[in-house]
Swiss-Prot record:
GO terms for molecular function: ATP binding; ATP hydrolysis activity; helicase activity; nucleic acid binding. A motif (DEAH box) lies at residues 345-348. InterPro entries: DEAD/DEAH_box_helicase_dom, Helicase_ATP-bd, Helicase_C-like, P-loop_NTPase, RLR_Helicase. Residues 879-895 have a biased composition (Basic and acidic residues). Residues 696-763, 775-895 are annotated as: Disordered. This is Y' element ATP-dependent helicase YEL077C. Coiled coil: none annotated. GO terms for cellular component: cytoplasm.
């Protein structure tokens, strides 16, 4: 806004809409000035935009939140004038006109200036327009200089002053102000060169690096060299889109004068691990998760942060970017740390992911203009999708005309900023005019059972290519878990879906990508985007709702060719898509649908119509064609051998399936338990009724009568009582003819042949008839004796003859010889000869031996007596996991899986279990991943923040406490008694070990050791322990409040600790009379001595033992450091000598991993301040210990009982803490030394520790009980 008499002389256009006036021509200059002031003169610094005065007043009423009384606008103007006057008085000669100018620019009247600020009557109306402008510009220049921004700005003056406008009386005083300033931004930048990209490529790929094609080269140069602020790229999956920004990022990182910090965002958590591995290889870039940036700020090292869309949309990230320059300037004292690229991968999801669009709303608040360039990448974003996706996040959208890759031009006008400038689209798919994914063989099949067909394909693939990998895309989370548990017996499986927490998704994805032994990744469609897996040769999709984008993304995982199968059930209808979603793919040619999606020219009737689909193999690689041929030959061989693989039933949508399977299929230790009760039950249930019927029919009437008579109440009671954990025993006791038959199903082919050979003709026929699925159905339908006979008679002569011909005396004899004499006699006495023969023949030598050895004569009698149909049925239902375990593992691997009988009590639990589950859910509700036991006790969030329990995991628990294997990981119960509930974020076991940590907070070493003995009945029952813990809930809360009031005062309210307030400290320690400088000098000297002597740090601070460990000082990362400590036995000595033995054996070792991430970040940022302090002290700067050595020091001090007792005696403001996280936080608070200078408490700790080690104890000796150490300097319990 321009003031002065000559305002009318300025050529001002009516560039604004004038509202509130009937005739705009009657609007005066004063009215226009008022409109400008109230509409365009208030700045929102968070967003970097202008706001109206009404909006600004609303902010004034609400902000700042912590101010008890808000300032009004007049008071804010007065504060502005005070700053202006201070600026003029501190840097320039006081000038009446110039002082008044600052006040007038703040909209103060002349009366206000004279009465309040003591200035004579003056207004800018008394001077000419040019002079008024000059005065205002000079005031603005002083303001910029006073704010310290003159290093970022320089003023270039151009002579614009008209002599006629200058009054004579002002000429002498204004000669040196005849130039008007124009403020321009200085951006330090090292010149870029095309050679930078080539050097980056050689760093990443070696000296033989070359671009894929000319399109990739030119586009890479466009991103790095051109000033285009926003670029969108569509390239086919597998093209190398990552290198388009990876190489420019490496080139930016090589610049010495500017540090560029860039951000990459991907749609799903599963892509994080893969992206960080790819982008961090060769050490060319420092890569970190964006969560570190959001929680802790910029660390000064990272080149690229990687996150997901939810991070991009978060308010915390938006605020960090808005305050970037201020934070960097204050933290690093430089303006040479800049925001580089904002990269968004698979950005089409902003438009196509309808169900997530509400989560993307926060992205519109992001200051895109703060970044040097925005890059949007996708393999499935045609112009219409790309334009809508960009507009959805607040950008202008695509430029009207799509740019040709061969017509790259620099933009003429970029002054509007990134957010208002249209995005240039580079469509490499249209440029190349080729249908993507032609290198993949795509097959669409309708099948009876999708899982069955998928399993056949996978087994055939791994037989052809044993080192290959595959991805299976399921439609629901329940289906994912069902398939994982069913297929685990065939190959190693990793499964992922959206209900897993973020850390678990990242961990499992990383495991599949890096572990060469993992074969199959099963998941929902989130596993199909962006992930790059070596050795991937097959993708199978079982989703009927698959749209064209999901299809292209899924097939695109096959980088170097392979097979993609789209399996759908016969007579099934594709589900209706939601509003706004793309429709499912149609029947017919896949290539034609891909062409239509990308807008490519149709080639109907021409050569090349089918590309990798509809049986065409023209565009496939030789390796892919060879794989197809091998798969075809295996399929023919399987068909000839009639090997039917019966997989899971198609009903995967059972509501409670996740209760049983969730999180128990991911680790090797639980692989056996995945072959769970229901699978075994179904195996036994598949022994159809005809076998039992034929067995009973072969028992003569007299035997049946005696059998029924021997089944009494005592036998039933004994059977029921045996249903305990010893499943194997109960299974053996109830072995019947039916069970024997089911055992034979799991026997190798050789054993089956010998079994058949030892059976009479009638029985052999019956068994052979049941070898195929169709025959089994006919047998099940023929349950009476008459039809059984007809079934047997339908067996062709060839089979019977070949079976009989395989009968040898030796096999029969060996089978009978393996049956103990007692058992055989009791069996024969209760059963006819025919039954005995069939029993012996249906049992292989090994199985008969193990069964008989586990059954006494009495048990055998009761077993034989239970041969009626009812008892046989109960035997089948009670078959447990151990029945399968008795068989050969290799035999299990190759034999067919039978249908699962989903018995309600095994899948959903009994009514008592359901009731218990509901009670626990009500008592311990948790829906947040951050839920912890402190919240359950009733602590507020600000208290929980400082009474944190980070670093408390399963390794905190001693061995044997909540660490049983083979049980539910969430509640440590048997699977059929599991009380975990679907959607539970925090397991009962985790809450139990946190409750144990809370109890540790309140007990010293001896008391805690006794407590562990008292709760011994709960060592295997975390749920029972939680109930026991909850009874004392109020008492524990009150006790923590009392015992840790001092701790919360120091850490939460930051109350200052002064050594002069400690009477015992001043009287008994020289350290408490030292200045802050002396304490720091002593601290640096101790570390200098340790470094020179290569002393092992943890052992030294634990008991002053100066053992050498050179490997520790030479270690470059945390892993090598821990290995060095373990090699010299530090952790073992720590557990044997201190209270560390009350935790798990890995607890201390794991403290060096990621447990103390936030504390580590704070410490590493403080290293620069320590260096400045040393220089200020006038001493030669010494190396400050790196993080691992610093943490070793604090851990050693924590477990040094003698030192702890002395420190607590001397420093009266602190008391005992018994958890390592609390000790670490306490050690970083600041204390006032004797001269009132601040030093970190850990420096004071080292000084006290050094004083204890000194032979010359300073005046004022301590209590002998606290200070004496034995001659060996070992720390006792």
């Amino acid at each position: 806004m321009t003031l002065g008499n000559s305002y009318d002389a300025f050529n001002h256009d009516p560039w604004m809409d004038v509202v509130g006036f009937e005739d705009p021509n009657q609007v005066t200059n004063r009215d226009i000035s008022r409109i400008v002031l109230y509409s365009y003169m208030f700045l929102n610094t968070a967003k970097g935009c202008l706001v109206e005065y009404a909006t600004f007043r609303q902010y004034m009423r609400e902000l700042p939140k912590n101010a008890p009384q808000k300032l009004n606008f007049r008071e804010m103007r007065q504060g502005l004038i005070a700053l202006g006057r201070h600026c003029v008085g501190s840097r320039f000669e006081t000038d009446l006109y110039e002082s008044a100018t600052s006040e007038l620019m703040a909209n103060h009247s002349v009366q206000t200036g004279r009465n309040i600020y003591g200035v004579d009557s003056f207004s800018l109306t008394s001077v000419s327009g040019t002079t008024a402008t000059l005065l205002q510009e000079r005031a603005s220049e002083r303001w910029i200089q006073w704010l310290g921004l003159e290093s970022d700005y320089h003023c270039s003056f151009s002579s614009t002053r008209n002599a006629e406008d200058v009054v004579a009386g002002e000429a002498a005083s204004s000669d040196h102000h005849q130039k008007i300033s124009r403020v321009t931004r200085k951006r330090p930048r090292e010149p870029k060169s095309t050679n930078d990209i080539l050097v980056a490529g050689q760093k990443l790929f070696g000296s033989s690096f070359e671009f894929r094609d000319l399109h990739q080269l030119r586009l890479c140069y466009e991103i790095y060299m051109a000033d285009t602020p926003s670029v969108a790229v569509q390239a086919p999956p597998g093209y190398g889109k990552t290198e388009l920004f990876h190489l420019p990022l490496i080139a930016l990182a090589s610049k010495g004068d500017v540090k560029y910090v860039s951000f990459l965002f991907v749609p799903y958590t599963v892509l994080l691990a893969n992206c960080m591995i790819r982008l961090g290889r060769c050490g060319c870039l420092n890569v970190a998760p964006v969560r570190n940036f959001i929680e802790e700020g910029y660390d000064g090292v990272t080149d690229l942060y990687v996150g997901i869309y939810d991070d991009l949309a978060s308010t915390n990230f938006t605020d960090r970017i808005a305050a970037w320059e201020n934070i960097v300037e204050c933290t690093f004292r430089t303006n040479n740390v800049k925001l580089g690229y904002l990269i968004v991968d698979e950005f089409h999801n902003f438009e196509t992911e309808v169900y997530r669009q509400s989560q993307f709303g926060g992205i519109t608040n992001l200051d895109f203009d703060a970044f040097e360039k925005a890059i949007f990448l996708s393999g499935t974003a045609p112009e219409a999708v790309a334009d809508a996706a960009l507009q959805r996040i607040g950008l202008t959208g695509l430029a009207k005309k799509s740019m040709d890759i061969n017509e790259l031009k620099r933009s003429e006008d970029l002054s509007r900023g990134l957010s208002s400038y249209p995005t240039r689209m580079f469509n490499l798919i249209k440029e190349k005019s080729e249908v993507p994914l032609g290198h993949v063989h795509k097959i669409r099949k309708k099948v009876e059972s999708q899982p069955e067909e998928a399993l056949k394909l996978l087994l055939a693939l791994f037989e052809s290519e044993p080192e290959s990998k595959a991805i299976v895309v399921a439609s629901t989370t329940n289906e994912v878990e069902e398939l994982a548990c069913s297929w685990r017996k065939y190959f190693r499986v990793v499964w992922i879906h959206g209900k897993l927490d973020a850390a678990e998704k990242v961990s499992r994805t990383k495991e599949f990508v890096t572990d060469g032994n993992m074969r199959v990744l099963i998941g929902t469609k989130l596993v199909t985007e962006g992930i790059d897996i070596k050795q991937l040769m097959m993708v199978i999709m079982l989703d009927n709702r698959l749209n064209i984008i999901e299809l292209i993304q899924g097939v695109g995982r096959l980088r170097d060719g392979g097979l993609c199968y789209l399996l759908s059930r016969k007579n099934s209808w594709a589900a209706r898509n939601r509003k706004g979603e793309l429709p499912p793919i149609k029947e017919g040619c896949i290539t034609e649908q891909v062409r239509e999606f990308y807008g490519l020219e149709s080639k109907k009737g021409k050569k090349g119509q089918h590309v990798g689909c509809c049986g065409s193999r023209t565009d496939l690689s030789a390796d892919t064609v060879e794989l197809i041929e091998r798969m075809d030959r295996l399929a023919e061989k399987q068909a000839t051998a009639s090997m039917s693989i019966v997989a899971l039933p198609s009903n995967f949508q059972e509501s409670n399936s996740s209760d049983r399977y969730r999180k128990y299929c991911s680790s090797d230790e639980d692989s056996n338990t995945c072959i769970h009760g229901s699978a075994n039950a179904s195996t036994n249930a598949s022994t159809n009724a005809i076998t039992t019927a034929s067995t009973n029919v072969r028992t003569n009437a007299t035997t049946n009568a005696s059998t029924n008579a021997t089944t009494n109440a005592s036998t039933n009671a004994t059977t029921n009582s045996s249903t305990n954990a010893t499943t194997t025993a109960s299974t053996n006791v109830r072995t019947s003819a039916t069970t024997t038959a089911s055992i034979n199903v799991r026997t190798s082919a050789t054993t089956t042949e010998s079994t058949n050979s030892s059976t009479n003709a009638t029985t052999t026929a019956s068994i052979n008839v049941r070898t195929s699925a169709t025959t089994t159905k006919s047998i099940n339908s023929s349950t009476n004796a008459t039809i059984t006979e007809s079934t047997n008679s339908n067996t062709n002569a060839t089979t019977t003859e070949s079976t009989n011909s395989k009968t040898s005396a030796t096999t029969t004899a060996s089978t009978n010889s393996n049956t103990s004499a007692t058992t055989t006699e009791s069996t024969n006495s209760k059963t006819s000869a025919t039954t005995t023969a069939s029993t012996n023949s249906n049992t292989s030598a090994t199985t008969t031996e193990s069964t008989n050895s586990n059954t006494s004569a009495t048990t055998t009698a009761s077993t034989n007596s239970s041969t009626n149909a009812t008892t046989t049925e109960s035997t089948n239902a009670s078959a447990k996991e151990d029945a399968n375990k008795d068989g050969n593992a290799e035999d299990n691997r190759f034999h067919p899986v039978t249908d699962i009988n989903k018995e309600s009590y095994k899948r959903k639990g009994s009514q008592m279990v359901l009731l218990e589950r509901k009670k626990l859910k009500a008592q311990f509700p948790n829906t947040s991943e951050n839920m912890n036991v402190l919240q359950f006790l009733g602590f507020r969030s600000d208290e929980i923040k400082h009474l944190f329990l980070y670093g408390i995991d399963i390794y905190f628990c001693p061995e044997g406490v909540f660490t049983q294997y083979g049980l539910c990981k969430g509640c440590q119960k048997m699977f059929e008694l599991c009380v975990c509930w679907a959607g539970q974020k925090v397991s009962y076991r985790r809450m139990a070990w946190e409750a144990l940590a809370v109890e540790r907070m309140l007990r010293n070493d001896e008391e805690y050791k006794e407590y562990l003995e008292d709760i011994e009945p709960y060592h295997g029952d975390p749920v029972g322990y939680l109930k026991y813990f909850s009874v004392k809930r109020r008492e524990i809360y009150s006790q923590i409040q009392r015992n840790y009031a001092w701790y919360l005062a120091i850490t939460r309210r930051r109350e200052t600790i002064s050594v002069l307030d400690s009477t015992r400290g001043k009287q008994g320690s020289q350290v408490f009379r030292m200045s802050g400088r002396q304490i720091k000098e002593l601290y640096y000297k101790v570390w200098s001595n340790l470094r020179e002597s290569k002393t092992e740090v943890l052992q030294y601070f634990l008991n002053w033992d100066e053992k050498k460990c050179q490997e520790e000082w030479e270690a470059k990362d945390d892993t090598v450091f821990v290995e060095a400590l373990e090699k010299v036995g530090v952790f073992q000595r720590l557990r044997s000598m201190t209270s560390a033995g009350l935790q798990g054996p890995q607890y201390v070792k794991l403290q060096f991993s990621r447990h103390h991430r936030q504390l580590r970040s704070r410490y590493e940022l403080s290293l620069g301040m320590h260096l400045r302090d040393q220089i200020a002290l006038g001493v030669t700067p010494s190396k400050v210990p790196h993080w691992t050595a610093f943490l070793s020091m604090l851990i050693g001090l924590f477990y040094n009982k003698t030192f702890r007792q002395k420190l607590e005696y001397l420093l009266e403001q602190i008391s005992e803490v018994w958890l390592l996280p609390h000790w670490l936080d306490l050690a970083n608070v600041e204390v006032l030394a004797a001269d009132n200078t601040k030093v970190p408490l850990y420096m004071l700790m080292v000084a006290v520790h050094k004083e204890l080690d000194s032979d010359d104890v300073p005046d004022g000796r301590f209590d002998i009980i606290l200070l004496c150490r034995d001659s060996s300097r070992e720390v006792g319990e």
